[in-house]
């Protein structure tokens, strides 16, 4: 096939009209709605008429030579032999003549200015787009402007299109002969170098790049397109379908694919890269089970059908051009749609340029700032940019204090993992995609990135997609629907290998010998992330499903037990743990810890001290939240003290992040304050709270509660818990003295003070005396804030020990408890808690230090003040009035930091009571009291009450 013939045929059939023939093509084209409404038969009629109109003027090729008459007749034969009425112009249908006349008469009509397609970003954000490339909106916000998403058609594919695809897949291509010219013309992604592609009639500046390919290069490239079939061997319906595909072909999708100056990559390379990608991802992620698809070269019913891996009959092409953009490098992402058996509750979006797997290839991708994200990149590419994912990982590990680690995000209640292990530039920790997706989801809740704040609905949409992705990657316990309500995909989503676990949607490889130790720990941490955010929302009752799954899996993995020592033949822990930056990928062997009861025998794998500490911290975090939620939702404990009496207590957070693994620590649940993190000051309080919860459950037992309340055993338990609270109070004083007086006295010895107290973990630079003094002062303030929070919760636990948790029972006072000595002691603790809250507001005005935990203790510490204000009204003491004012201020700060319904409700109740204390009685005083009672009745801590879980 000559180059001249190829160029001429490309001129006649290329979907990108040249500047010379663009006007004529615009005249012959109908509107986009007409093209979508008509079938391939109608599109073929348009093609025939445009060719006949161009027959007289275009009978010569670009070199001025007349076109071969045989070629013209042959073209007419190949394209029209299924339609006898179009063999020559004299036999045309009158309807076609009428349509042709209408098109010719409408040539002078004004061109429509309405754009036919918005860019991918504007489409996703539902923002008005000007149709340019790049568009004004993407330029303004620095977004990647692409037109690469699939153009969808209404309804299912026609039988003709499916038959054409089947024929294209079965017939081999012809490398030479006259059919090669037609093959070249049918390649929608190939354009002649002297033509300017247009975008729906508008010139696209993205295509204005130098093209230096000579004729021979174009010829070899066109002949290398294996998937384009010889039209002589296609059945008539296939010809009609492909002819119609030319007329209705969407050109938008080729902005980033059909640039002849961009590098090409053979499909074998892409397939090898795809396998490389699968080898680096978690074997349990959905993408790893997707088959290797061949890339479709036929048009079918979509301009993107060649990128649709789910097409049942597809042909392969030997070369593919990759588009590039300014923000997302040309790496990138080639057409993997969501699996066909995606769960019904996981509505993954249709393929956008970012729904495709990322290929780790130096020439096609920039350096990823945090390589730990590699397993999740293929899944999040359609949701957030790669740079934003790295920023969100930074947000997750951001500390609000430079002196001691304190998570800035309200949804990160405690650090389970080392920051350096995740953010290491070359040897990061190996993580499951589900854990990484959940971390990004948690960070996206509060990140101030422009991508999440403009428009205002962007954060909700991104967080929803990340949540669905996290659940899909986690494959959690799925409760089966009722009989007759099973969705079509339900059976496909249930990967069941055993009878015992099959009913809950859990396969044996998740908990058995096929799962990795760290993978199982990552799953528990993912459950924690999901449960924490949902607990802080208005769906508190729903969060218990996730907490229960986390507690159950932690118990099955025996996280509450210390692992046996490593085998002697392995490298000692001291040698491996001495280098915190060692190859972390080697710290996570694939087999599960069989010594915990999974798998044959009692062989013990080697596990590093970092992995052991991750297990401990995860257990203690679940242990603390179990007791905290038992108070919040009026429920019994799930994790028992007996299960973890031999488990070492978590180490100091600053030492943990620095990689300085301590060898000596106490075991069992702690009762003394030891540090600035939630494991240091909050975990001991939760140990004591667990005993109070057990005591309260025994008091409220429907059959044995009355006898227990009047027994000596109950009184002995109360005294023991009170003693433990006194021990904690003493440890709190010693903690304050140790971290305030010693730092203040040692401030002059700047270098020694900084080295001795491990306060330079944030930045090793800046060792001037002013910097050291500033950090010492910040450490002192941080210590005082921890002491204030610990003091407040300790006073609340004293109030809870009295057994009056329910606000309605307090207001009714049926047992006259308000006149007892126990009430007087509890009231003193209520005033003490309010004073501690005043100190908290001084050091932490927005209550951002521990917003997830603090709300319930602020609420329970306020019920007695509400009771006093309701009973005494204007006769209340000044200390009670000040305490009520402090509680109102604290609730207002809580509403700003972590807005929840019960805090908004109780703030209104306390404001109403405070107005009564100050003597401002409204006219409808009785109605307000009744309304206040109705509001408080929503939150009950009686025998069958559910607390905050509405």
Curated annotation (Swiss-Prot):
Family per record: Belongs to the xlnR/xlr1 family.
Gene name per UniProt: xlnR
Source superkingdom: Eukaryota
Organism this protein belongs to: Neosartorya fischeri (strain ATCC 1020 / DSM 3700 / CBS 544.65 / FGSC A1164 / JCM 1740 / NRRL 181 / WB 181)
Keywords recorded for this protein, A-Z: Activator, DNA-binding, Metal-binding, Nucleus, Transcription, Transcription regulation, Zinc
Organism classification: Eukaryota, Fungi, Dikarya, Ascomycota, Pezizomycotina
Alphabetized InterPro entries for the sequence: Transcription_factor_dom_fun, XlnR/Xlr1, Zn2-C6_fun-type_DNA-bd_sf, Zn2Cys6_DnaBD
GO (cellular component) term, any one: nucleus
Gene Ontology MF term list: DNA binding; DNA-binding transcription factor activity, RNA polymerase II-specific; zinc ion binding
Name used for this protein in its record: Xylanolytic transcriptional activator xlnR
CDD domains referenced in this protein's UniProt entry, alphabetically: fungal_TF_MHR, GAL4
Biased composition (Polar residues): 23-33, 81-92, 302-329
Location(s) in or outside the cell: Nucleus
Pfam families, per database record: Fungal_trans, Zn_clus
PANTHER family in the record: XYLANOLYTIC TRANSCRIPTIONAL ACTIVATOR XLNR-RELATED
Biased composition (Low complexity): 8-22
Keyword Metal-binding (UniProt): yes
The entry's DNA-binding region: 119-145
General function of this protein: Transcriptional activator of the xylanolytic system. Involved in the regulation of extracellular cellulolytic and xylanolytic genes and in the regulation of the intracellular activities of D-xylose catabolic genes in the pentose catabolic pathway (PCP) in response to the presence of D-xylose.
Major site of localization recorded for this protein: nucleus
């Amino acid at each position: 096939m000559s180059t001249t013939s190829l160029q001429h045929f490309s001129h006649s059939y290329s979907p990108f009209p040249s500047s010379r023939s663009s006007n004529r093509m615009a005249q012959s084209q109908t509107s986009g709605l007409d093209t979508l409404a008509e079938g391939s038969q109608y599109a073929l009629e348009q093609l025939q008429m445009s060719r006949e109109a161009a027959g007289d003027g275009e009978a010569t090729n670009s070199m001025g030579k007349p076109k071969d008459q045989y070629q013209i007749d042959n073209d007419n034969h190949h394209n029209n032999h299924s339609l006898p009425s179009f063999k020559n112009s004299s036999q045309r249908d009158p309807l076609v003549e009428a349509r042709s006349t209408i098109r010719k008469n409408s040539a002078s009509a004004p061109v429509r200015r309405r754009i036919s397609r918005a860019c991918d970003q504007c489409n996703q954000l539902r923002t008005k787009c000007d149709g340019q490339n790049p568009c004004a909106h993407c330029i303004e916000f620095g977004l990647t402007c692409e037109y690469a998403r699939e153009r969808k058609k209404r309804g299912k594919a026609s039988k003709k299109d499916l038959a054409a695809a089947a024929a294209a897949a079965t017939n081999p291509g012809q490398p030479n002969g006259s059919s090669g010219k037609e093959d070249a013309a049918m390649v929608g992604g190939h354009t002649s170098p002297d033509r300017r592609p247009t975008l729906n009639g508008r010139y696209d500046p993205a295509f204005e790049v130098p093209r230096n390919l000579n004729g021979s290069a174009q010829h070899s490239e066109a002949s290398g397109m294996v998937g384009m079939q010889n039209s002589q061997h296609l059945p008539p319906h296939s010809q009609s379908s492909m002819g119609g595909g030319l007329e209705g072909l969407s050109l938008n999708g080729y902005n980033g694919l059909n640039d002849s100056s961009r590098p090409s990559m053979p499909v074998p390379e892409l397939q090898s890269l795809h396998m490389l990608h699968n080898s680096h991802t978690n074997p349990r992620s959905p993408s790893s089970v997707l088959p290797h698809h061949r890339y479709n070269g036929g048009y079918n019913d979509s301009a993107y059908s060649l990128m649709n891996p789910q097409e049942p009959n597809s042909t392969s092409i030997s070369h593919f051009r990759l588009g590039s953009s300014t923000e997302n490098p040309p790496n990138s992402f080639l057409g993997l749609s969501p699996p066909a058996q995606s769960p019904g509750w996981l509505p993954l979006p249709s393929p956008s340029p970012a729904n495709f797997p990322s290929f780790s290839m130096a020439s096609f991708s920039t350096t990823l700032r945090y390589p730990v994200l590699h397993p999740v990149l293929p899944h999040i590419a359609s949701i957030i940019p790669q740079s934003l994912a790295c920023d969100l990982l930074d947000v997750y590990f951001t500390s609000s204090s430079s002196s001691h680690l304190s998570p800035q995000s309200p949804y990160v209640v405690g650090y389970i993992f080392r920051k350096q292990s995740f953010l290491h530039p070359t040897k990061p920790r190996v993580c499951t995609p589900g854990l990484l997706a959940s971390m990004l989801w948690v960070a996206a809740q509060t990140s101030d990135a422009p991508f999440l704040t403009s428009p205002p609905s962007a954060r909700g949409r991104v967080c929803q997609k990340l949540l669905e992705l996290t659940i899909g990657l986690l494959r959690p316990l799925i409760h089966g629907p009722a009989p007759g309500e099973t969705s079509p995909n339900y059976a496909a989503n249930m990967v069941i290998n055993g009878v015992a676990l099959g009913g809950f949607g859990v396969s044996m490889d998740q908990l058995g010998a096929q799962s990795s130790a760290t993978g199982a720990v990552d799953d528990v941490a993912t459950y924690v992330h999901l449960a924490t955010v949902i607990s802080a929302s208005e769906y508190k009752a729903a969060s218990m499903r996730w907490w229960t799954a986390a507690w159950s899996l932690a118990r099955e993995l025996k996280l509450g037990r210390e692992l046996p020592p490593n085998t002697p033949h392995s490298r000692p822990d001291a040698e491996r743990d001495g280098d915190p930056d060692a190859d972390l990928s080697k710290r996570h062997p694939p087999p599960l810890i069989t010594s915990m009861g999974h798998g044959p025998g009692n062989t013990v794998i080697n596990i590093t001290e970092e992995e052991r500490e991750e297990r401990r911290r995860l257990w203690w975090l679940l242990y603390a939240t179990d007791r905290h939620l038992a108070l919040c939702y009026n429920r019994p404990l799930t994790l028992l003290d007996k299960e973890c009496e031999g488990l070492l207590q978590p180490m100091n957070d600053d030492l943990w992040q620095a990689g300085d693994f301590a060898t000596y620590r106490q075991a069992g649940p702690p009762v003394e304050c030891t540090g600035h993190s939630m494991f240091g000051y909050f975990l001991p309080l939760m140990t004591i709270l667990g005993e109070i919860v057990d005591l309260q459950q025994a008091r409220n037992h429907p059959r044995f509660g009355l006898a227990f309340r009047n027994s000596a055993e109950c009184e002995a338990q109360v005294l023991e818990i009170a003693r433990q609270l006194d021990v904690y109070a003493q440890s709190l004083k010693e903690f304050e003295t140790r971290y305030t007086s010693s730092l203040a006295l040692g401030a002059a010895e700047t270098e020694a003070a900084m080295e001795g107290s491990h306060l330079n973990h944030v930045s090793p630079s800046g060792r001037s005396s002013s910097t050291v003094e500033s950090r010492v002062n910040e450490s002192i303030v941080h210590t005082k804030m921890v002491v204030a929070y610990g003091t407040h919760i300790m006073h609340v636990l004293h109030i809870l020990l009295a057994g009056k948790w329910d606000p309605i029972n307090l207001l009714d006072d049926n047992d006259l408890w308000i006149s007892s000595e126990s009430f007087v002691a509890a009231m003193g603790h209520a005033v003490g808690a309010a004073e501690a809250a005043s100190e908290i507001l001084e050091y932490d005005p927005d209550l951002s230090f521990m917003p997830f935990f603090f709300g319930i203790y602020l609420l329970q510490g306020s019920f007695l003040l509400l009771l006093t204000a309701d009973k005494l009204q204007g006769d209340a003491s000044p200390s009670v009035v000040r305490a009520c004012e402090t509680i109102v201020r604290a609730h207002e700060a809580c509403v700003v930091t972590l807005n929840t319904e019960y805090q908004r409700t109780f703030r209104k109740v306390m404001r109403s009571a405070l107005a009564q204390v100050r003597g401002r009685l409204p006219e409808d005083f009785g109605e307000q009291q009744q309304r206040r009672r109705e509001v408080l009745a929503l939150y009950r801590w009686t025998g069958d009450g559910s607390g905050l879980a509405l």
